[in-house]
C-alpha cells in the first residue's frame, strides 16, 4: 500500500485549516491493481478493496489516478455536499465520442444545465395528465406477455428476457413516436443488445485506462464485449435518429403527438445564440434524450423485472406474502390500478429490497471529476481527478443496513406494517445528488406497474432442484447472469 500525495495548498477547501490525510492508493503493478483492472466482477472487487484500503482510496492506472468512493458518507459528501465541485466530466475518451457524448449524464457545465432543464420540461409537459393513458398502454403490452407465457404451459422453463424487453420497447416506442412496435420492429429487435451495454461501458473504460503494454492482452479477453458495446450503442442511436427524422417530416410547431414533438418544440424555443454559446444541437436535446429513454428505460426496466421475477421464484415464502397482499387489496381476478399502490405496503417493500439487494445500478454511467482542488473527508482531491462512485458499496454499507447481504423485504416496513419512506430514503437505485436519474418517476412507474401486474397474474418458481443463483454480470447496471423460471397462471378461470 502506498499513498496518493498532491500539493494540498487549497485556499477554499472546507478543511483548509487541517492537515490533509493521505489517500491509501492501489499502486500500478500490484496484484490488487491487477484485480481491479481485470476481474469480471468489478462491483465485488471494488467493494472488497474497501475492506482493505478503506471507504476512500485511490487507484493508479496507465492514464490517470482515480478516487473510489465506497460508502454512503463518502458518496454524499462528494455528490450532494459538493455537487458544485464534482460537476464536470472526467477526461476520458469514451465519454467524449458519439453517440454517448450527447447523453445528458455525460455532459457538463452550461450545456448540461440547458439540456437537463429542456429535457425535464419536455418530460413534465408530456406526462402531465397522461398517466392513466400510460397505464393503459403498458397494460396492453402486459396482456401480450401474459398470453405468451400462458401458451407455453406452466411447466415450461424459460428466460423472460425477450418477452419483457420487446414489450417494454414497444411501449417506449409509443411514448416517443406514438405507435407500438409492428411486425418489422419485432422481427429485427434483439433483446440481448441492451444487456451488452453495462458491461461494455466498464470494460471499454478499463481498456482506455490500461497501460499500453497490457492493452493487447486485455482486448483479447474483453474485445468482444467492447465491440458489442460500441455497435449496440450506435445501433440504438441509429434507431432513434431514423424515427426522429420520420417524425420531423410531419412536425408542426405547437402540435403535440408524442414525446418527440415536445422535445422538438422545446429545442425550437431555445434562442439560436444560446444554443451556439453552450454548444447545444438537436443531437443532444432530441436524439441524445430519446436514446436515453429507449436505452435506460428499456434496459433498466427489463433488467429490474428479470431480477424481480428471479427473486420471486427464489424466495417462495416472500412471494406468498406478495400474493396474499395483492389478493387482499386488489382481488385475485381483478385488475391492479395505480390507486392500489398506496395500500400495497409489502409489495412496495419487496420491490425496494430487490432493487437494493441486486444493486441494479452498481455505479453511475457518468464519470464525475473535480472541477477544482478540494477535500473529501479530509483527503485531498486534485482538480480533474475522476471519481468511481460505488453504488453497490452503498447497498452493502453496514452503517445503513443490518445484515446487508441478506434479502429481507421487511427492512422496508415500519413496525405497523406500512411502507417505510425513511428506509427508502437510504436507497439510491436512481442515483444521488443533482445528477440522479431525470426519469426516476417514470422508471418507478414502469417497474411498479410491470411487477404488480405480473406478480398478480403468475406464480413463479425455479426448475426442479435448481439452486438459487443471484449472480450478476458486472457493469454500470447489474444484469442477472441467468434467469430460468417457470410461470403458473393464478387466474381462477385457468384453475
Curated annotation (Swiss-Prot):
Coiled-coil segments: none
PROSITE patterns for the chain: CYTOCHROME_P450
Xref: Pfam families: p450
GO BP: any one term: progesterone metabolic process
Cofactor list: heme
The keyword ATP-binding appears for this protein: no
The UniProt record lists the keyword Ribonucleoprotein: no
Example GO molecular function: steroid 17-alpha-monooxygenase activity
InterPro entries named in the record: Cyt_P450, Cyt_P450_CS, Cyt_P450_E_grp-I, Cyt_P450_sf
Binding site for heme: 437
Alphabetical list of PANTHER family matching this protein: CYTOCHROME P450 1A, STEROID 17-ALPHA-HYDROXYLASE/17,20 LYASE
Membership in a protein family: Belongs to the cytochrome P450 family.
Role this protein plays: Cytochrome P450 protein involved in the biosynthesis of polybrominated aromatic organic compounds. In the presence of ferredoxin, ferredoxin reductase and NADH, catalyzes the coupling of bromophenols and bromopyrroles, forming various polybrominated biphenyls and hydroxylated polybrominated diphenyl ethers (OH-BDE). Can also mediate the heterocoupling of 3,5-dibromocatechol, forming six different compounds, including polybrominated dibenzo-p-dioxins, which are among the most toxic molecules known to man.
Protein name per Swiss-Prot or TrEMBL: Polybrominated aromatic compounds synthase
Species whose genome carries this gene: Marinomonas mediterranea (strain ATCC 700492 / JCM 21426 / NBRC 103028 / MMB-1)
